[in-house]
């Protein structure tokens, strides 16, 4: 008895850290460098950014294993399978024509290792034997750059279940980004399982279909289970997995064309992929590449831009795009293109996607219209499964969800939305309902609320009476603007810049500057719930009224030492990308997000990109070197200017309440860049402070108590319960509704 042929065993035997793989890739690398095979130039058209021979050698090594695996599992030799065009034009067989003894020895060694495994019997459940090996061999940064993630079998099965895919070969299925064929193999397994049950019913004790039945079954599978991919290595692996799934059913003498095609499903959508007419599919499934627009190659962005525009996926103004709204994902375009070009009317699409598509404000607006262009067909979303808490992809923190939609019908809101979370044994599933947070704007972020909650969206959501702002932004030069105030010195304050901060390394210097432009700095880590304590200082050389840098003539005359300090960093400051793009005619030390609100004496401050709202009241700081000064939050914090201490504490209490935290989490991405941004107040009905309202005064008193308890290291749970009850009253919530939230 040999070893069991399983995906994890192959990855363990031939993984990146094994000695045979390290030696094998080195042998292939040397051979490729010496021979410069024509296949190398062709391969570089698919991987233009690859330098040297390492990746080409690694791909060739993987391809060698694929060939040997097919031979071992199916009994088909290289001459048979590849001679019959099973893998089409093969970029990775170049080593066969390079007569080098080390290459032959490597092939023999790999064949001997593969021979240690027993081929799986026909009818064995099997699966994608190659995906895990690929993910072990190819470096994770490269896989993630290409948007490639390992799809676990249970998630594959879930996607097929969503489209109610069973085993009907009259139902045509496509994976337009099939990778190594995970979804294709899973579909084939379902078809074969039913065929074997039928065979057993017709002839008890025999699960194998008759030869003529097997041939016809394979023909039907070839016609109904199809894959595309633009990576030639993925196409090769998918064809191998496809063939292995059909082992024992195909006559060895058959000439076959596995229906997995080398094809860019997006850019080549209008071109035929096989002989004869391209019939639309009943189902489209898969795990499309997750690649941000900014990370796409420049040429691909240019080539695909008309499609983004055709489908209305670019919905932002230039200003909105500059501030992060252009962080679109290629999966958006894949879904729309696949639905448009490959899916029949009334057909269903189910795909693994990033959950941010449903709540990312700006970047996802066009996608959430669920229409193929301004006058195109509708895409009706039937269900979303949110698996963020499960983290199906263990080697990445991507926010995972699955999407099910039907072509040709508008989306009916609310959409069933299921949140999965780890449980004892099987994961827990909690039912929610999703709808646009702005009913008049179908592209607005989805608002999620527990199914069955009596409170309507209209009662919960409303615009704030307050305006929030980002903190002061140095434009990537924190190491210049952020300083440590050391001591009083003749003519000013001796400072030392925090050289290790910011996107660019700067020289550490000590210098005397005028105290008037120096303020206590609140960094992200300085702010927590009911506590905000500055840990450094910031030089604020911005005119808060004009919102540009202080006039340079004025700065040089009135604050000569501060001007001299910034002048020594002039090259760096003038080289900031944001400065060159937006303020190159302004003083070179100009900052961003600075206005009168920045220096307001009393503020409420919270951190964005957090997992919940953690707000604190910030009042003037008694600085030992500067005297009384307002604290300045950095740009990763958000602030509200307040006119009094009571007003600030009232607002702080409301923002820290469970009601507000529910509302923020219900329409934005916890921990994401869009969480807790100023725009959250577009949907949080934070009323203007009213000193005549008993509840407002009680909330202010509760916030003061919570600040005091936090400073003393005492828990605030009891006072927080009172805050939640009072805020619930402001929203008109019943006790049961408040508990649900």
For each feature predicted by the language model, list its residue ranges.
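Active-site-adjacent bridging/hinge elements
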Residues: 34-47, 126-141, 161, 206-218, ...
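Structural motif
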Residues: 47-65, 121-125, 325-327, 508-515, ...
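Polybasic, glycine- and aromatic-enriched phosphate-binding surface used to engage nucleic acids
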Residues: 332, 438-698
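Signature of N6-adenine DNA methyltransferases within the class I
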Residues: 154-155, 185, 192, 235-236, ...
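Charged, often flexible domain-edge or linker segments that flank or initiate folded functional domains
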Residues: 1-100, 145-279, 335, 354, ...
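Non-catalytic DNA-recognition/assembly elements of restriction-modification systems
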Residues: 681, 685-741
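Short, hydrophobic/amphipathic alpha-helical patches that form generic packing surfaces
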Residues: 56-75, 135, 240-247, 520-524, ...
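Class I S-adenosyl-L-methionine
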Residues: 71-72, 76-162, 521, 534, ...
């Amino acid at each position: 008895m040999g070893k069991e042929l399983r995906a994890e065993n192959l990855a363990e035997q031939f993984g990146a850290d094994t000695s045979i793989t390290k030696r094998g890739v080195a042998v292939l690398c040397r051979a490729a460098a010496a021979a410069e095979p024509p296949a190398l130039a062709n391969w570089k058209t698919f991987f233009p950014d690859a330098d040297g021979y390492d990746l080409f050698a690694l791909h060739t090594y993987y391809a060698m294993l694929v060939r040997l695996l097919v031979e071992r599992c199916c009994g088909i030799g290289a001459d048979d399978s590849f001679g019959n065009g099973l893998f089409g034009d093969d970029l990775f067989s170049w080593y066969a024509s390079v007569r080098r003894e080390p290459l032959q020895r490597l092939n023999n060694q790999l064949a001997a290792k593969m021979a240690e495994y027993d081929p799986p019997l026909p009818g064995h459940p099997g699966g994608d034997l190659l995906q895990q090996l690929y993910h072990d061999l190819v470096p994770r940064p490269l896989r993630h750059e290409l948007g490639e993630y390992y799809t676990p079998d249970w998630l594959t099965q879930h996607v097929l279940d969503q489209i109610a895919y069973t085993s009907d070969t009259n139902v045509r299925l496509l994976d337009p980004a099939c990778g190594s064929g995970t979804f294709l193999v899973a579909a084939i397994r379902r078809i074969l399982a039913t065929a074997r049950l039928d065979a057993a019913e017709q002839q008890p004790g025999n699960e194998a279909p008759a030869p003529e039945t097997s041939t016809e079954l394979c023909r039907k599978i070839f016609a109904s289970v199809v894959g595309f991919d633009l990576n030639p290595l993925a196409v090769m692996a998918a064809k191998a997995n496809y063939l292995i799934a059909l082992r024992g059913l195909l006559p060895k003498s058959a000439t076959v064309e596995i229906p997995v095609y080398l094809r860019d499903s997006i850019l080549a959508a209008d071109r035929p992929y096989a002989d004869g007419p391209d019939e639309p599919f009943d189902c489209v499934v898969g795990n499309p590449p997750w690649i941000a627009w900014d990370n796409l190659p420049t040429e691909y962005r240019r080539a695909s831009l008309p499609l983004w525009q055709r489908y209305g996926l670019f919905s932002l103004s230039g200003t909105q795009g500059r501030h992060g709204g252009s962080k679109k994902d290629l999966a958006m375009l894949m879904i729309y293109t696949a639905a448009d070009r490959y899916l029949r009317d009334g057909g269903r699409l189910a795909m693994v996607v990033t959950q941010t598509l449903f709540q990312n404000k700006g970047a996802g607006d066009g996608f959430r219209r669920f229409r193929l262009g301004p006058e195109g067909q509708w895409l009706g979303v039937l269900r979303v499964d949110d698996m963020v808490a499960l983290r199906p992809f263990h080697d990445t923190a991507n926010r995972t969800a699955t999407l099910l939609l039907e072509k040709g019908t508008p989306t009916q809101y609310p959409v069933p939305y299921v949140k999965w979370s780890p449980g004892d044994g099987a994961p827990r599933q909690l039912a929610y309902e999703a709808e646009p947070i702005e009913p008049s704007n179908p592209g607005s972020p989805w608002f999620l609320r527990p199914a069955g909650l009596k409170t309507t969206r209209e009662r919960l959501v409303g615009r704030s009476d307050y305006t929030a702002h980002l903190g002061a932004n140095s434009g990537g030069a924190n190491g210049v603007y952020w300083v440590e105030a050391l001591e009083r010195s003749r003519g000013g304050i001796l400072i030392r810049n925090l050289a290790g901060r910011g996107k660019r390394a700067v020289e550490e210097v000590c210098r005397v500057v005028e105290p008037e432009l120096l303020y206590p700095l609140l960094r992200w880590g300085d702010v927590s719930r009911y506590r905000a304590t500055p840990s450094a200082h910031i030089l604020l050389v911005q005119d808060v009224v004009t919102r540009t840098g202080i006039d340079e003539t004025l700065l040089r005359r009135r604050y000569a030492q501060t001007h001299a300090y910034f002048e020594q960093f002039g090259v760096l400051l003038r080289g900031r990308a944001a400065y060159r793009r937006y303020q190159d005619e302004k003083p070179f030390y100009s900052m961003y997000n600075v206005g009168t609100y920045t220096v307001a004496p009393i503020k409420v401050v919270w951190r964005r990109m957090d997992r919940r709202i953690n707000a604190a009241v910030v009042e003037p700081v008694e600085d030992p070197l500067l005297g009384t000064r307002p604290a300045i939050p950095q740009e990763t914090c958000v602030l509200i200017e307040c006119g009094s201490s009571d007003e600030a504490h009232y607002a702080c209490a409301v923002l820290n309440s469970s009601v507000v935290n529910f509302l923020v989490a219900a329409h934005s991405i916890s921990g994401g860049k869009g969480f807790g941004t100023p725009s959250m107040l577009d949907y949080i009905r934070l009323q203007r402070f009213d000193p005549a309202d008993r509840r407002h005064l009680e909330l202010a008193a509760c916030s003061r108590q919570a600040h005091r308890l936090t400073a003393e290291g005492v828990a605030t749970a009891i006072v927080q319960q009172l805050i939640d009850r009072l805020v619930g009253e402001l929203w008109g919530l019943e006790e049961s509704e408040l508990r649900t939230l």
